[in-house]
Amino acid sequence: MNSGFTHITVLLEEAVEALAVRADGCYLDGTFGRGGHSRLILSQLGPDGRLLGFDKDPQAIATGQALAAEDGRFVIVQRSFAELGSETQERGLAGKVSGILLDLGVSSPQLDDPERGFSFMNDGPLDMRMDPARGISAAEFIATAPAEEIARVFKEYGEERFAKRMANAVVARREVQPFERTADLAEVLKVANPAWEKGKNPATRAFQGLRIHVNNELGDLEAGLEAALDALEVGGRLVVISFHSLEDRIVKLFMRKLAKGEADNMPRNLPIQFKPFEPKIKIHGKAQFASDAETKANPRSRSAVMRVAEKLR
């Protein structure tokens, strides 16, 4: 494991405070990363408390295994949090978890390590997989997908305005030479993007789209939210930190639907009577953002949005 890359945990105190940790509770960290949130949770648990960590990244798993060797209250598994339903079932924890934390997106060590292939800033192999042993790499996707599919990924997941133009440039270039390096792809995307945003690399959105697609991030999020609700006990808390509008929209709509129902979207004078909506969760407060002090110390926290819900039934 390369220890030269550090990670500053975003909304550390705020997220753990939102969990309302009980000393004897059972908690789940769905995105262990480098263990910032997990360590703070463990510091608030008593001898009977338990914490289960999830991560797909082998470097995160190595860090988690070292922590598990130090603290018997902690266990880590190499799975996506989308699979927390089956994991909690297997461990007899379904409906018994006191709180679940999901800190979404890519970590600083993943972005900063060129060998992981996440960043256009540092040249490396074009991979982008959280778990390099599973699924296809970004290079494999770019090499085989039709232009229409590449454009869809750039537009739908990267919110890239010039997705079609950039995808066509990628396909034209791959017919001459395949893409193997991040800098190579970034250069082609840069040339194909006719309208650069001030202060933003023109490959940013396309790279985000690729990463989300390769790791099925939005699909995992939707599955993980549903599984989290089933895993929680009544009164248990769900805390989610997202880093871009696509993630936050999914979290916001999921919580709103379970807290308020869909009655507001129905016509007022329907000839049938609907059963009164019974909320499944209560939303705690408004969306929370990193403080000015935190964003100054850690610029990557600027886009963080935290939402909190409590299971009612």
UniProtKB/Swiss-Prot annotation:
Coiled coil: none annotated. It is found in: Cytoplasm. S-adenosyl-L-methionine binds at residues 35-37, 55, 81, 103, 110. Its main location: cytoplasm. It catalyses: cytidine(1402) in 16S rRNA + S-adenosyl-L-methionine = N(4)-methylcytidine(1402) in 16S rRNA + S-adenosyl-L-homocysteine + H(+). NCBIfam families: 16S rRNA (cytosine(1402)-N(4))-methyltransferase RsmH. HAMAP family: 16SrRNA_methyltr_H (MF_01007). This is Ribosomal RNA small subunit methyltransferase H. It comes from Pseudomonas syringae pv. syringae (strain B728a).
